[in-house]
Amino acid sequence: LITVRVDHHSPNSRWYSGAGIYRRVWLKKYPECHILSDGVYISSDIDGNVTITAETARPKDMPVAGLQLRQTIFDGDKLICTSTNNCNAAFDGSFPEPVRINEAALGSNTVTMKIPEPVLWDIENPHLYSLTTDLIKDGEVIHTVINKFGVRKAEFTCDKGFFLNGRHVKLHGCCEHHDLGALGAAVNRSAIKRKLVKLREMGINAIRTSHNMPAVEFMELCDEMGILVLSEGFDMWEKPKTDYDYARFFREWADKDVASWV
């Protein structure tokens, strides 16, 4: 039995925050060798070169021999490319302290794959590919993680503004809080989608989140619907703006929260 209690005090922000546990909570069970939670990082260019880094954990007394990572890119159900490599023993990143695994050896693998003639993600055609990462031990798949991603290039210039895939794009944006009006702060995917559909009908193509890290469901829907996102992390830093806001926890939690956010 696991019991979680929320100690709610107000005012804790300058806006309606809601109270309680209003987003999904995961209790994850992993094999002793596994891919870290949120441990797959994907970057790409418009030529279709996709760089993937996967972070893994295993018992310290377990040799890395016999462990492999297989990455496979799909376009819908169509297999585009695949790559299998032996796991590295070394880890070149940082591991957030709250989820540190006792007596774990950490490793990271980076591989670059090629999507021929990629369909680019765009606000008018938000095309998404799917990456399946399999951790293999002695020939058997023991852990699988699936991520969706788009192939695109985003850049800002000081004199001409924003470009997406080399095309000049005007940002028609809004500042959007996480609550759902009369429905409150609890995450509701269909209600979020309804709101985003209405914003798109108004001509919105970009959203700045306010003023905390957005829900996973919100980010997934923006990817699927062709909406650019300026994702804001904090509104309070070390100096508080209200009596019970995030400034109370900033020194202890900011670095860890950013790691899980990114």
Where is each model-derived feature located?
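Secreted/periplasmic carbohydrate-active enzymes, especially glycoside hydrolases
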Residues: L1-V229, E252-S260
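Active-site-adjacent "subsite" loops/lids of carbohydrate-active enzymes
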Residues: H172, S231-D255
